[in-house]
């Protein structure tokens, strides 16, 4: 009887000890997980982290930016309409030599447009290129995204598609277009985009025939010149309070391009790209170079791999310069928390316009970057000037 009592007491003590150890292990595991969770929140935030709506557009057209911003302010899930409004505003305001300005015809004197829009939530993309007869090309690009299973439509077929959906056909070429084109023809069609043909394209208008391959000179590629107020592509990026991105671009194409040419504004990842899980990017510059390297896509993927927006922007521009030493252009990068950065090269100065962001009262503020040929300044979400590199965990929008 005594032996049974001792065994029972021993069993009870063992059970109590095991229970105590189990509680201790669970407690330690809880606090360990709590510390890990707190660390993750500190570094990366949570789904409930407050995001301030943000509207960014390339170059310094503040009115178009404000019109897009007014749409974004109406509430969540207005990013699509906001970027479209920005593109249409620039169409109507004749931003630069863009769109309705009529001063960017192809080598036959015809004005064509291209545009694209991308949804960062579903990674859906719609674009048109080399399209005649439709003034608001961004509306047609949006229709490609929403009503078809395709991504890009081009040329007269894109115009036919627009007409089938009820968009009014308009003759875009005007007196200014003809005047600019005639002046270019009288100057021997200089500059143009031909090479390794005869007669020499540096002196003649053509028609051209190919040179035998052994006569190809492969001269150093001269980049397409981009100067303030003389660019032909604009891009808009919108981020709402729910962390949803839309990006869009619209262009009238490189001046005096060969007919049929598709530009960066219509190519996924060249002029625009967005992924809600990571962020978004817009690029501007020599479109043929941008199409070869897809800088907007590269910038987003660089952030996915762990780079901060300022690091991603600078890395992309430096990569472009390694292969195209005369490249002129810029990239603006935004992560999923609304932290933005930009880098440029080959220009005297690059401008982009920002509305929104945490702590900012001034809307449509113009950010300016002084650019170098091989090294770029980096703007890191702040006032104008030179900006230091700051650790990611401290890179919160400053008020």
UniProtKB/Swiss-Prot annotation:
- InterPro entries reported for this sequence: Ntn_hydrolases_N, Peptidase_T2
Under the heading CDD domains, the entry gives: Glycosylasparaginase (cd04513)
Q: List the disulfide bonds.
A: 90-95, 189-205, 344-371
**Which residues belong to the signal peptide in this entry?**
1-22
Molecular function (GO) terms for this protein are: N4-(beta-N-acetylglucosaminyl)-L-asparaginase activity
Q: Name one GO cellular component term.
A: lysosome
Keyword list, A-Z? Disulfide bond, Signal
Return the similarity comment.
Answer: Belongs to the Ntn-hydrolase family.
Please state what the protein is called. Answer: L-asparaginase-like protein GE13669
Q: Which species is this record about?
A: Drosophila yakuba (Fruit fly)
Q: What is the lineage of its organism?
A: Eukaryota, Metazoa, Ecdysozoa, Arthropoda, Hexapoda
């Amino acid at each position: 009887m005594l032996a049974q009592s001792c065994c029972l007491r021993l069993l009870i003590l063992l059970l109590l000890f095991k229970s105590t150890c189990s509680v201790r292990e669970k407690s330690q595991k809880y606090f360990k997980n709590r510390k890990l969770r707190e660390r993750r929140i500190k570094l990366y935030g949570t789904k409930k982290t407050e995001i301030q709506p943000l509207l960014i557009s390339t170059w310094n057209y503040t009115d178009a930016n404000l019109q897009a911003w007014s749409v974004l302010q109406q509430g969540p899930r207005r990013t699509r309409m906001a970027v479209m409004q920005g593109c249409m505003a620039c169409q109507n305001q004749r931003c630069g030599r863009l769109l309705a300005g009529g001063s960017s015809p192809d080598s036959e004197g015809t004005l064509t447009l291209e545009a694209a829009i991308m949804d960062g939530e579903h990674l859906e993309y719609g674009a048109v290129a080399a399209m005649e007869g439709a003034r608001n090309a961004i509306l047609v690009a949006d229709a490609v995204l929403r009503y078809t299973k395709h991504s890009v439509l081009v040329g007269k077929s894109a115009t036919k598609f627009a007409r089938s959906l009820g968009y009014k056909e308009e003759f875009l070429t005007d007196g200014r277009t003809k005047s600019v084109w005639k002046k270019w023809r009288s100057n021997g069609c200089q500059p143009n985009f031909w090479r390794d043909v005869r007669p020499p394209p540096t002196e003649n208008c053509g028609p051209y025939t190919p040179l035998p391959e052994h006569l190809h000179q492969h001269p150093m590629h001269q980049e397409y010149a981009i100067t303030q107020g003389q660019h032909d592509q604009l891009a808009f990026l919108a981020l709402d309070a729910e962390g949803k991105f839309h990006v869009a671009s619209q262009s009238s194409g490189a001046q005096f391009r060969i007919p049929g040419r598709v530009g960066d504004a219509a190519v996924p990842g060249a002029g625009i790209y967005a992924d809600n899980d990571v962020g978004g990017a817009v690029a501007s510059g020599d479109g043929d170079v941008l199409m070869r390297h897809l800088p907007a896509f590269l910038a987003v993927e660089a952030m996915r791999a762990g780079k901060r927006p300022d690091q991603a922007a600078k890395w992309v521009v430096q990569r472009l310069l390694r292969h195209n030493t005369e490249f002129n252009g810029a990239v603006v990068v935004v992560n999923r928390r609304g932290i933005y950065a930009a880098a440029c090269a080959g220009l005297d100065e690059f401008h982009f316009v920002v509305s929104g962001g945490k702590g900012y009262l001034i809307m449509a503020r113009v950010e300016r970057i002084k650019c170098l040929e091989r090294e770029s300044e980096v703007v890191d979400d702040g006032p104008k000037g030179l900006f230091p590199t700051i650790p990611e965990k401290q890179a919160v929008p400053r008020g």
